[in-house]
Regions:
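Conserved alpha-helical scaffold segments that buttress catalytic/binding sites
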Residues: 2-306
Length: 306
């Protein structure tokens, strides 16, 4: 180029800026996929978790692709937009196969698939998409989700259903379990199954993110793939009013976001989900912006793999 030819100036950021939403597209070669799973039926607490995927998509327009704290720039990261699974009107039992199959299509061809629920019943088909014989599961959740299945599937028993399906308890780690939010029966089930249990007190003593890192390392020792379920009710209720099951004394949102980046960075994490965000209960867009930031943090972690 002749030295006298000037480069075109960058577009003014008063007119446009690059957002995380702009990373979503139809690039079939993308190593990351985004799949909306608007499952809301059979929630123990009534709400509108089915609205969460669309709300998250809209909030991604508020997230810049640049993290000034670490210098991470997501501008060159493509995310395949796999759309939404049509399960809003279905029960968890009816939605199982459609969610499993849609997630499997992505996990078989991508390094990381991000599922946006929906209630926590999306976790069971998500884990099945990886295959029970090779998968490890970490749940970041205030609850065991070990309610009995004799009354049918709901958002309070995906872990119980997975154990009944054949997932080994030793391949399950549950972090952030809250006092006075679970039953003795569920605790006993977890112990008998061999599930690794870390309470909120454990998180306060050892560090939430440290425990997530430790369990990722433990599971990676014998699992081919790891699924991480991010139930936002693990966050302190004061910081997450849009989570029907959140309790006072939960995890700080900063730690929840840090765990998202840690999970995104781990090479054996093949699928993550965000569950139990209810836009109908949101206050001042706290939940929407937290969900969008969570998505950005997962991508920032994944970018570190490369």
């Amino acid at each position: 180029m002749p030295s006298h030819v000037e480069k075109a100036p960058e577009m003014s950021e008063n007119n446009a800026w690059r957002s995380v939403h702009g990373l979503l597209g139809a690039d079939t070669a993308a190593r990351v996929a985004f799949l909306g799973v608007p499952l809301g039926r059979e929630s123990i607490t009534r709400g509108r978790c089915d609205l969460a995927p669309a709300t998250l998509r809209a909030a991604l327009k508020r997230m810049s692709v640049y993290d000034l704290e670490t210098g991470t720039d997501l501008s060159n990261l493509a995310v395949f937009d796999a759309g939404e699974v049509g399960v809003a009107a279905l029960t968890p039992a009816e939605a199982f196969a459609p969610i499993r199959d849609a997630a499997r299509t992505q996990t078989q061809t991508r390094a990381l698939t991000i599922l946006a629920g929906g209630n926590n019943a999306i976790t069971r088909p998500g884990v099945h998409a990886l295959g029970l014989r090779k998968a490890g599961l970490i749940t970041l959740d205030a609850h065991f989700d070990l309610r009995d299945t004799d009354g049918g599937l709901n958002n309070g028993n995906p872990i119980q259903a997975l154990l009944e399906d054949g997932l080994e308890g030793a391949a399950v780690s549950q972090i952030g379990l809250a006092p006075f939010a679970n039953t003795r029966k569920a605790h006993g089930k977890a112990r008998r199954a061999g599930i690794t249990v870390h309470t909120l007190a454990d998180c306060a003593t050892n560090g939430f993110v440290v425990l997530v890192e430790s369990e990722l390392e433990r599971l990676s020792g014998f699992c081919e793939a790891i699924y991480v379920d991010f139930d936002i009710d693990v966050i302190d209720r004061a910081q997450m009013p849009a989570a029907p099951g959140a309790r006072p004394g939960g995890i700080a949102v900063r730690d929840f976001l840090a765990a998202a980046r840690v999970a995104g960075a781990h090479p054996k994490v093949k699928c993550v989900d965000l569950a139990e965000f209810d836009p109908g209960r949101d206050v001042g867009e706290i939940g929407a912006l937290t969900a969008a930031r969570w998505f950005a943090e997962v991508l920032a972690g994944f970018a570190a793999r490369q």
